[in-house]
Amino acid sequence: MSGGKYVDSEGHLYTVPIREQGNIYKPNNKAMAEEINEKQVYDAHTKEIDLVNRDPKHLNDDVVKIDFEDVIAEPEGTHSFDGIWKASFTTFTVTKYWFYRLLSALFGIPMALIWGIYFAILSFLHIWAVVPCIKSFLIEIQCISRVYSIYVHTFCDPFFEAVGKIFSNIRINMQKEI
């Protein structure tokens, strides 16, 4: 068994074992592996992150993009002194900026650790517990659904059809008396 490369949906290459008849994931891929042998191989855990655009999927556009004007506003005719307004703006902006950085420095890595563990557990449970339970339930419910279907067609359908025929001949005439 020799090593080969596997290309994921983003175009990154990963090493996979290749057998003479192809690997178990992509049969007969030895020729393909030789074609892409010269390309660079990426590890899924060392992908580059963008330090400029830190919200590429725009998760927080509406939630935390809060500026001074979004929080504090003076209506026309009710204005404080210009110096107070400028100092308030500067104080708000700088305090928000540095306090966020302080909180990020203190709690960012522990929170990332907690959320990483949480989503790892969630992924593990989904892959190894939830999906197999659902598949098992769907397989088991098929025989019950067949029995239920036979019961409904045998007993319930004739009963409700008869009741429907009984009530289908009822006519109601509404007359308004003056």
UniProtKB/Swiss-Prot annotation:
Region of interest (Interaction with CAVIN3), ranges: 82-94
Region (Required for homooligomerization): 2-94
PTM annotation (N-acetylserine): residues: 2
Gene Ontology biological process: caveola assembly; cell differentiation; negative regulation of endothelial cell proliferation; receptor internalization; regulation of cytosolic calcium ion concentration; T cell costimulation
Molecular function terms from GO: molecular adaptor activity; oxysterol binding; protein kinase binding; transmembrane transporter binding
Region (Interacts with SPRY1, SPRY2, and SPRY4): 149-160
Post-translational modification: Phosphorylated at Tyr-14 by ABL1 in response to oxidative stress.
Lipid attachment residues per UniProt (S-palmitoyl cysteine): 133, 143, 156
Region called Interacts with SPRY1, SPRY2, SPRY3 and SPRY4, residue ranges: 131-142, 167-178
N6-acetyllysine modified-residue sites: 5
Intramembrane spans: 105-125
Cross-link annotation Glycyl lysine isopeptide (Lys-Gly) (interchain with G-Cter in ubiquitin), location: 5, 26, 30, 39, 47, 57
Membrane topology of the entry: Peripheral membrane protein
PROSITE patterns: CAVEOLIN
Function: May act as a scaffolding protein within caveolar membranes. Forms a stable heterooligomeric complex with CAV2 that targets to lipid rafts and drives caveolae formation. Mediates the recruitment of CAVIN proteins (CAVIN1/2/3/4) to the caveolae. Interacts directly with G-protein alpha subunits and can functionally regulate their activity. Involved in the costimulatory signal essential for T-cell receptor (TCR)-mediated T-cell activation. Its binding to DPP4 induces T-cell proliferation and NF-kappa-B activation in a T-cell receptor/CD3-dependent manner.
Family classification: Belongs to the caveolin family.
The name this protein goes by in its record: Caveolin-1
Species annotation: Felis catus (Cat)
Gene: CAV1
